[in-house]
Amino acid sequence: MALNSEVMFREQINAMRSQAGRKRATSLQSFCSGNTDDSSADSTDNMDMMVDYPQQKGVSCMRARFNSESTLSKSFRKKVKKLAQKDRRSKERLNGNSEEDAIEVPRGAPSTYAAPSKLRKSKALDCLVSEKPKDEGRSEDSGHGADIEMAKGHFNDVRMKVFAARTAMQVEPALVMKTRKALEMKNAVLENHQSPGAFSLHAAYKIAASAESRVGSITPCNKKVTKEAMANLIRSSYDDTEITQELLFSSKFDSKWKGRYTDIYMRRDENGKKPKRPVNGQGWVMPLKSICEKFGINSTFFTNHRIDLKSARDQVLLMRLLSHDQTSTWISDIHPEAVKNETLAEYLLRELDASTMQKRVQAFKANVLADRDRVRVAGQFYNNIRIGKRMFGAARKAKYLSTIIGGMERRFEILENSVNHIPFTHSASDNNQEKCRNPRVHCRDSTRIALQFPRGQYLGDFIHANRISGKPLFNEFIMTQAPMKNTVDDFWRMVWQEEVPYIVMLTSRKEPERCEYYWPKSPSDPAVTVPGGLRIENFGVYQAPDPLFRVTHLRLIGPDREERHVEHWQGDVNNSSNMYSPLNILRLLRNASKPVVIHDHLGVSRAACLVAAEIAICSLLRGPTYKYPVQRAVQFLRQRRPFSIETPMQYIFVHRLVAFFFRDVIGSAKELDVDYERWLQERSERMFLDDLAAPIPGYRLLSPRADPDIVRMVGRPERPNYRREAPDCVGEMPNKVAAVDGILSPAKSVFEF
């Protein structure tokens, strides 16, 4: 009897398999989607799983019951449906998905995930006894799956970027195409290599932008480095520091160093002594040791201990940044009076009051930490509680934070307000628009440099440059825009006229559209000649301890064979995380007795950050005391160079530079650092159209190519050149207009009212 019942049961299952096109009986599709209106798909798959559902080891299983029409009985269908609903609810609780946590999708926004497709019966049954099924054709690592938490994160990344990209692409569409092509070319090189590290200051970008072509001629960047090519480079690097530095700090060669390369550097010196073999026998140890010996850096931390190349070179770069000897002896030996500031030396010896200075610095830190503002946290609400049932209005209570960076942003908005605008005249720049990079950045007439060289020959007196001098500064700055093709001669006329000892260039040398190459690249290049009998020659390149800057020695020969010498410091100072290099260059310029030239693309962004930081530092050193010295420093700078400090990022960077300069007096401002990292995280969600393969992301740059804070100003009219007075009669009716001629256009004034 038992055998007959078992045979009958198997026949019923086979009959159920062969029946095609029947109506849905068990709602198998609803087990994973929860929808009872879906139609069941035809299936010829194995149905044996139904017999032992749910799986219970050691316990009698729930047996399937069939009607005479070879369909499951109604009671069994109810039990299976209840179990499926219970399983679905438990998974929703684990995933944290509920109706209250539903995403608010903006109108017109694209959908980020699709509903699951129809499944076969066997896969639906497997879902009940194992895990939730995945869509066919989708990988487990897909970011657009049905997981609601991943969809939330995708929404937060996409919603703002779609709008920002649509706006920014209208401004610079060529930049998008250029970035895409550059990324495709670099993809083969950067695919399997890592960035050199935080302190490397984007060494890969620095090497790519370098004028040194000896490495590129041996091993092109788009090809793999062979053993023969690497061996030739190692032999060439023994006598060439430039090649050694490129090999060590380019991530392309990280995996190419072998222990046998150490023997190439184990040569005998002039006295016939052979160097001692280091404990760390990796191939890069001896080349890196040679660089450390050149800059006076102790190399025992990696020669006597086995550490990796990335950690060693990061530490070496940090030591180079911390080096106090950032100057070369070339210009100090020739013109010692040009690098000795008597005003600064006199003040430090006789007038400095250390106690008062310390009180000013402590008050600066206290005011910065106390000047906070309430800032709304994007996308966060108080427990997601709905505070009303109205159809319109706020649906949820927004979350606010009292932040230090918010207070700095509010101070910058106060500076940008037309109430604090400083009117000025700019007739000279209006008459020489062809010599201005941006017609909206005017040059103030009262502080501009009027060219008078050469004597007795008028070649025009305009150059877009302003003099920054006066207390509290100890020296003079000349802030100017990057030279253009038609202003290179004017630039060198200004350098000769003002007897400039230092020129600081804060932009990249590989962007001719942002800065013209106005000096000889190498000693073998022809000299630059300027009308009036001026000649500029390259005397060589000096390897500065600061790895960011490239120093070129220039000799200027005047009309009467008079010689002057200038040091040209070039570095792409655009990384907001690097505090050492800006302070090192300010230490160099502070000791100059003659005016120094500093420029970036427009002369109002990176150069303005360094000069504003120097003004604030000198104000804290010698007084007077201000409650907000950085805000006062920016006002002081804008009185001489209008439009300086363009974005809140640059204004915050000046605060961080000043706090970092006085870190030995006030200690580390941990609250400021934590709040700054939180602000950077929010800033990273905005759209920056920069090189996608760059080691430093766009949101950390001081002046990215498409800054969202500047892109939103596109299309707005130029700022009026007048100071709007604060209303002193609030609450009173406005005065009666005398006539309509002043408020109507000529076209409408002909109508009679």
Curated annotation (Swiss-Prot):
Residues 84-94 have a biased composition (Basic and acidic residues). Residues 26-46, 77-116 are annotated as: Disordered. The keyword DNA damage does not apply. Residues 35-46 have a biased composition (Low complexity). PROSITE patterns: TYR_PHOSPHATASE_2, TYR_PHOSPHATASE_PTP. Disulfide bonds: none annotated. It comes from the Eukaryota. InterPro entries: Oocyte-zygote_transition_reg, Prot-tyrosine_phosphatase-like, PTP_cat, Tyr_Pase_cat, Tyr_Pase_dom. It is found in: Cytoplasm, Cell cortex. Its main location: cytoplasm. Residues 408-661 form the Tyrosine-protein phosphatase domain. GO terms for biological process: cortical actin cytoskeleton organization; eggshell formation; oocyte maturation; polar body extrusion after meiotic divisions; positive regulation of protein localization to cell cortex; signal transduction. GO terms for molecular function: protein kinase binding; protein tyrosine phosphatase activity. Disruption phenotype: Severe reduction in the number of hatched larvae. Simultaneous RNAi-mediated knockdown of egg-5 results in no viable progeny and causes endomitosis in the uterus, generation of polyspermic embryos and defects in meiosis completion, polar body formation and eggshell chitin layer formation. In addition, posterior formation of F-actin cap at the cortex oocyte and its polarized dispersal after fertilization are impaired. Prevents mbk-2 localization to the unfertilized oocyte cortex without affecting egg-3 cortical localization. The keyword Cytoplasm applies. GO terms for cellular component: cell cortex; nucleus. Keywords: Cytoplasm, Developmental protein. Inactive phosphatase which acts redundantly with egg-4 in the oocyte-to-zygote transition. Required for polarized cortical actin cytoskeleton rearrangement in the oocyte before and after fertilization. Together with egg-4, required for the cortical localization of kinase mbk-2 in maturing oocyte until the end of meiosis I. Also required for kinase mbk-2, pseudophosphatase egg-3 and chitin synthase chs-1 localization to cytoplasmic foci after fertilization. Part of a complex, consisting of pseudophosphatases egg-3, egg-4, egg-5 and kinase mbk-2; this complex is required for the oocyte-to-zygote transition. Interacts (via tyrosine-protein phosphatase domain) with kinase mbk-2 (via 'Tyr-619' and 'Tyr-621'); mbk-2 tyrosine phosphorylation enhances the interaction. Belongs to the protein-tyrosine phosphatase family. This is Inactive protein-tyrosine phosphatase egg-5. It comes from Caenorhabditis elegans.
